[in-house]
Curated annotation (Swiss-Prot):
Keywords: Cytoplasm, GTP-binding, Hydrolase, Magnesium, Metal-binding, Nucleotide-binding, Potassium, tRNA processing. K(+) binds at residues 226, 245, 247, 250. Mg(2+) binds at residues 230, 251. Homodimer. Heterotetramer of two MnmE and two MnmG subunits. Residues 216-368 form the TrmE-type G domain. (6S)-5-formyl-5,6,7,8-tetrahydrofolate binds at residues 24, 81, 120, 446. It is an enzyme of class 3 (hydrolase). Exhibits a very high intrinsic GTPase hydrolysis rate. Involved in the addition of a carboxymethylaminomethyl (cmnm) group at the wobble position (U34) of certain tRNAs, forming tRNA-cmnm(5)s(2)U34. Its cofactor is K(+). SUPFAM superfamilies: P-loop containing nucleoside triphosphate hydrolases. It comes from Xanthomonas campestris pv. campestris (strain B100). This is tRNA modification GTPase MnmE.
Length: 446
């Protein structure tokens, strides 16, 4: 255990009023501070009714106190939770009294940080706590719960253990450099590395899916002015989120709206119409539209169904940045007769609703069917996890190449770097500044 000398305190429930509010203490003085509040006779993991008193003996609040002795607590330290009424005034007064008795205000994420430092959970699990709290839909919440339960970490550990075995074999071969690699089990090393690279590649694919589950997909509505992008966003969102007029260039800024697709969050981004010219404000809107495209997972290209080819030509190469695209011919209700349709386009009318069900189906297929389908054991992941796995994969591939030419020292270094990248995910090889950045994004009471 990495015991901390100080005792910390914070409100553990969400901001605002509620039926119940919780103040959490963690550290060696937790029980003594509780006693000074007037809470005597605490028993391990037993709820005890008490009145919480100030320095003059006046009652601050009454409620339940629970003691979790070390190391059998969330943080691994002595923990006392004070459960009273959810009044921010009373909770702040209770925290102030605890501070007067020797505790200090906890930093953001400090309870989870202590749990990590005391070996109660690893870094990926600690991050999953924040992801679980912030989950925007049920699937994201379930994925975060699996990461908190260690599903992601165990798979990282499995690859890490395989890399450890490989490093042992390669380092041993370096010590016996006069012997050919094949006489030292070179074939088995290459076979193990091939298997490890396959595990790593699959883990990377699953982590990419986990990142999308956590962050959702960003779909940018792009197209020329007056193609009906804002009307389409309103139709998909089921509310009038964007201003709609007959004047081309009405949309000047980006507008984000989240919708749910079978329990998966898709963020729609309405953007300014792309065209030549325009005033300074409209040109800034078009610049922002192109910037959104650079970050998009999916481009919804909205064209006027009455002349889609001309609208396509007006876009130029703006959509080349997004590999996944869905062509939408809007305003199909204004066609006197059905015109020629591109094979890859969907005809809709944002005004009448024609074709919207087909569009919803196609969006679900793109969002859920391409690497986002529901699978057993899916877990939550973050961009930093995906980045670390990418680097681990690159180093493992480089190690394979070095082994082919029997460059053992170079192969050993590449394996070490791959191992180090994996260690960043669970926190086994993380710099202090990285830990500080991660935990500072947590809630104060976590």
């Amino acid at each position: 255990m990495n015991a901390s000398p100080s005792t910390i305190v914070a409100i553990a429930t969400a901001a605002g009023t509620g039926g119940i509010g919780i103040v959490r203490l963690s550290g060696p003085q937790s029980v003594q501070i509780a006693a000074a509040l007037g809470i005597a006779g605490l028993q391990s993991r037993h709820a005890r009714y008490a009145r919480f008193r100030d320095a003059q003996g006046e009652v601050i609040d009454d409620g339940i106190a629970v003691w979790f002795p070390a190391p059998h607590s969330f943080t691994g330290e002595e923990v006392v939770e004070l459960q009273g009424h959810g009044s921010p005034v009373l909770l702040r007064q209770l925290v102030a009294r605890c501070i007067a008795l020797g505790a200090r205000q906890a930093r953001a994420g400090e309870f989870s940080e202590r749990a990590f430092l005391n070996g109660k959970l690893d870094l990926a699990q600690a991050e999953a706590i924040a992801d679980l709290i912030a989950a925007g839909d049920l699937r994201a919440a379930r994925a975060a719960r699996r990461s908190l339960d260690g599903v992601f970490s165990r798979r990282v550990d499995a690859v890490s253990e395989s890399l450890t075995r490989l490093r042992i074999h390669v380092e041993a071969a370096i010590d016996f450099a006069d012997e050919p690699l094949d006489t030292l089990g070179g074939a088995q090393v290459r076979e193990e590395l091939t298997r490890t690279r396959a595990l790593l590649a699959q883990l990377l694919r699953d982590a990419e899916r986990g990142r999308k589950l956590r962050d959702g997909l960003h779909a940018v509505l792009i197209g020329p002015p007056n193609a009906g992008k804002s009307s389409l966003l309103n139709a998909l969102a089921g509310s009038d989120r964007a201003i709609v007029t007959d004047v081309a260039g009405t949309t000047r800024d980006t507008l984000h709206e989240a919708i749910q697709l079978d329990g998966f969050e898709l963020t729609l981004v309405d953007t300014a119409g792309l065209r030549e010219g325009g005033d300074a404000i409209e040109r800034e809107g078009m610049r922002r539209a192109r910037a959104e495209l650079q970050r998009a997972d999916l481009a919804l290209i909205v064209l006027d169904a009455r002349d889609p080819q001309a609208a396509r030509d007006a876009l130029g190469d703006a959509i080349d940045a997004v590999p996944r695209r869905l062509w939408i011919h809007n305003k199909c209700d204004l066609l006197a007769v059905a015109g020629p349709m591109d094979a890859d386009a969907i005809a809709v009318s944002a005004v009448t609703g024609q074709g919207l069900e087909h569009l919803h189906t196609r969006l679900r297929e793109l969002a859920l069917g391409d690497g986002i389908e529901s699978v057993d054991g899916e877990f939550s992941a973050r961009t930093r996890h995906v980045d670390a796995l990418h680097r681990a994969e690159q180093h493992a591939d480089a190690a394979d190449l070095e082994l082919r030419y029997e460059q053992l020292e170079l192969a050993a270094e590449e394996l070490r770097l791959a191992h180090e990248a994996l260690g960043e995910i669970t926190g086994k090889l993380s710099a202090d500044d990285l830990l500080g950045k991660i935990f500072s994004s947590f809630c104060i009471g976590k």
